[in-house]
Every structure is written in structure tokens, then in C-alpha cells.
């Protein structure tokens, strides 16, 4: 039943998908790969409210219902899967979540700045989305133009053949994620290139205050009225 995906109608700019403040698979399964008995973030702690890999599932559904509407991923699940990554649950290397899901863009890390800039550029059709810091996107490898200073990771196919190449990739990702001035990261997969733009600098104190002083209700969704959500308690 896909009616819930249509209740809000077609968005003016894009669909934004983030499964929550904790990796959905860690939240759903134990380290022994058994289904958890409860979920701290769902009404009445039900453990069956979300599918496996919800970013992928939700994106694929939205692309079927609204194929011409962009989908932007964000949150922990997408951030940790922006390039080739080891999936504990399937015990294998998986491609970028952009490939697996079919999403158009991915915002990684804390998204206060990139999401505001993304909306500004969606509203101004003259501006490119692909130069926004702290986003990742896919393009055809034949159309990709490298830049000086780019870090080219081993391709997904190379990582499948040699685990040391995946380890080398992971080192680059970790180093660039923690630099004040980072490099752009690229990786080839299935004739496409994943491009990960360097992040914004850390927010200033004033920027943090502005973000957290917005008029959030800090309440559960009204749909869950009368139901207990453990994390909110």
C-alpha cells in the first residue's frame, strides 16, 4: 500500500529522505543479526515499523511514483554509505547508496549548511547543484571532469578483488572527513563516477545557535498521540 507516500503530494523542490538519528540496521538488528525486541524511536517500541535499508526502499518507491522528482538522501545511513562500503548484515561490499537507491543527491554529515544552499540553488535554476560542498552525486564516467587535487579511490570492482584496496579507500575517506580543508573524492562504479564534494567548515557558535534556536516543537508526530515512544520519554 503506497498511499502514505502520496499523502503530502508532489513536492515543489525535492523529496528528502533520512531514516533517523541512528543507523537503521544497527537500530533494528543485534550484533548477532537477530531482530531486536523493541525500537526506542517508534510508537509503542514496535520493532517492525521500518524496512531493512529504508533509504533504498523509500527512494525506489518514490522514484516509481514520481519519477521526475529529485530525491535527496541524508542522515547517518546515507553518510556512511556514500562510496563502496562493507555491509555487516550481508557480509559483503556494497556499492554507493546512490547507486543502490537511485537517489539524485546525498548530503553527508551535519546538513545545516548544505541543505540551505541546496534549496537556494533548486530555486535558482541557473545554479549548478554539483558544486555544493558536502554533497555526493553520480555522473557518467565519460562526462566526469577531474580537478587538480582530487583523490581518486580504487573502483568498486577493484575493491571486490582486493580487500587492501578497500582498506586504502577507507583511510582516505576518514582522513578527508576530518580535515579543515579537504579534497574532493571520486570513485568509479558500473560506468558511473561517485563524486563526494569536500565538507563545509565547522559551524561557528553563532551559526549553531541560529540552527538550534529555531522554533522546533520537539514533540512526537501528532499521529502517534497516546502511544509511548521510549526515546522521547
Residue spans for each PLM region:
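Amphipathic repeat-derived elements
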Residues: 1, 6-7, 208, 214-217, ...
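Short acidic (Asp/Glu) and glycine-rich catalytic loops that position anionic groups and cofactors
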Residues: 184-193, 212, 220-223
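Alpha/beta-hydrolase fold catalytic core
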Residues: 100, 203-225
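N-terminal pre-triad scaffold of radical SAM enzymes
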Residues: 225-233
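Glycine-rich beta-alpha loop elements in corrinoid/cobalamin-binding modules
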Residues: 2-190, 196-200
Amino acid at each position: 500500500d503506497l498511499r502514505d507516500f502520496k499523502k503530502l503530494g508532489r513536492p515543489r523542490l525535492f523529496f528528502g529522505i533520512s531514516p533517523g538519528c541512528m543507523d537503521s540496521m544497527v537500530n533494528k538488528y543485534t550484533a548477532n543479526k537477530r531482530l531486536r525486541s523493541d525500537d526506542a524511536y517508534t510508537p509503542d517500541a514496535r520493532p517492525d515499523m521500518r524496512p531493512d535499508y529504508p533509504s533504498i526502499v523509500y527512494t525506489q518507491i518514490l522514484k516509481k511514483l514520481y519519477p521526475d522528482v529529485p530525491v535527496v538522501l541524508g542522515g547517518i545511513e546515507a553518510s556512511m554509505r556514500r562510496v563502496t562500503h562493507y555491509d555487516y548484515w550481508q557480509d559483503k561490499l556494497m556499492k554507493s547508496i546512490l547507486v543502490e537507491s537511485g537517489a539524485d543527491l546525498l548530503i553527508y554529515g551535519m546538513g545545516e549548511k548544505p541543505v540551505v544552499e541546496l534549496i537556494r540553488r533548486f530555486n535558482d535554476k541557473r545554479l549548478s547543484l554539483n558544486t555544493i560542498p558536502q554533497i555526493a552525486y553520480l555522473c557518467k564516467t565519460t562526462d566526469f571532469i577531474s580537478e587538480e587535487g582530487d583523490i581518486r579511490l580504487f573502483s568498486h570492482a577493484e575493491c571486490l578483488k582486493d580487500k587492501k584496496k578497500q582498506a586504502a579507500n577507507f583511510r582516505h575517506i576518514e582522513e578527508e572527513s576530518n580535515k579543515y580543508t579537504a579534497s574532493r573524492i571520486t570513485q568509479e562504479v558500473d560506468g558511473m563516477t561517485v563524486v563526494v564534494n569536500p565538507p563545509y567548515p565547522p559551524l561557528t557558535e553563532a551559526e549553531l545557535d541560529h540552527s538550534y534556536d529555531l522554533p522546533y516543537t520537539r514533540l512526537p508526530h501528532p499521529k502517534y498521540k497516546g502511544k509511548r515512544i521510549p526515546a522521547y520519554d
